[in-house]
């Protein structure tokens, strides 16, 4: 826990080298401090529960269904994507999925995974790319879910 005179109203938590650092205003009461510490410890535990092995297993299943098991890739949840649901680095075939999607329905997660897998084949949102993504029977529904939840900022997703 780190108290700061500059910090007036906000509380911040960071994980650095697997340690949780909580930044608090210096004028915060002990009761409020305890409440925030409990809240941030719970937040950290939730972050730990993101299961990359289950994500990889599901991505491999979708690779078999939609890409005939031809893609080689890595995939993991990340906590630093606030404006995207997923991203793909075409060059090293690395997929990152926002931890925000861990709370979304499975069919929405599947849509985002398929979308990112398709970027391994087509790095842009070309017609061929969209043909692949739209093979997913819940593609339109998932896009609607992301829009309705205010999560989707890019209409091309």
Region spans (language model):
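Walker B catalytic acidic pair
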Residues: 116
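Active-site-proximal or metal-binding-adjacent scaffold patches in catalytic folds
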Residues: 1-111, 120-157
């Amino acid at each position: 826990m780190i108290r700061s005179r500059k910090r007036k109203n906000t509380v911040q938590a960071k994980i650095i080298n697997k340690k949780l650092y909580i930044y608090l205003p210096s004028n915060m009461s002990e009761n409020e401090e305890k409440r925030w510490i409990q809240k941030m410890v719970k937040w950290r535990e939730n972050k730990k529960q993101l299961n990359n092995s289950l994500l990889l297993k599901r991505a491999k299943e979708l690779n078999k269904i939609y890409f005939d098991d031809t893609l080689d890739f890595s995939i993991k949840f990340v906590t630093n994507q606030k404006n995207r649901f997923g991203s793909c680095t075409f060059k090293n075939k690395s997929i990152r999925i926002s931890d925000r999607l861990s709370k979304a329905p499975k069919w929405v997660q599947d849509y985002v995974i398929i979308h990112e897998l398709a970027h391994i084949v087509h790095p842009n949102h070309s017609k061929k790319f969209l043909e692949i993504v739209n093979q997913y029977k819940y593609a339109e529904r998932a896009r609607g879910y992301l829009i309705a939840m205010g999560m989707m900022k890019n209409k091309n997703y």
